[in-house]
Amino acid sequence: MRDLKYLFAYSIPLSTFFSIYFQGIWAYSSVFYAFVIIPLLEFWLKQSSTVYSDQEKEDRIKKKLFDLMLYLNVPIVFGLLGYGLVTLHQDALWTYEQIGILSSLGILLATNGINVAHELGHRSSRFERTLSKLLY
């Protein structure tokens, strides 16, 4: 149950989807979420003081769920990037909407793109390193 907090990593892609789908002022939902909501949550919520033993750390590393969560970021990032670019190309958007969608895509690429690529780049398997290179 403690591991459910890691699903929070998908909140930026979700807000990016809202930015693209709803457009208008909602095009800035990722910007608002990343620079207002998340800092406020960090301010109000207590930081975990849990110290994991070496065995617990080793068990967490071996869990395939965390690997799958990392791998799932690749199609999510590319899917949202494609969806955003198609929307920018096909829809008649106001300039402020274009800026909002592009800003949201930039936040997505900076968080779920580069961070996941960096993490996968530390892995030893060829598959994981290839995923890392795709995201870079």
What do these predicted ranges mean?
Residues 121, 125-126:
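Active-site-flanking alpha-helical
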Residues 1-109, 116, 120, 133-135:
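Non-catalytic, topology-defining segments of multipass membrane proteins
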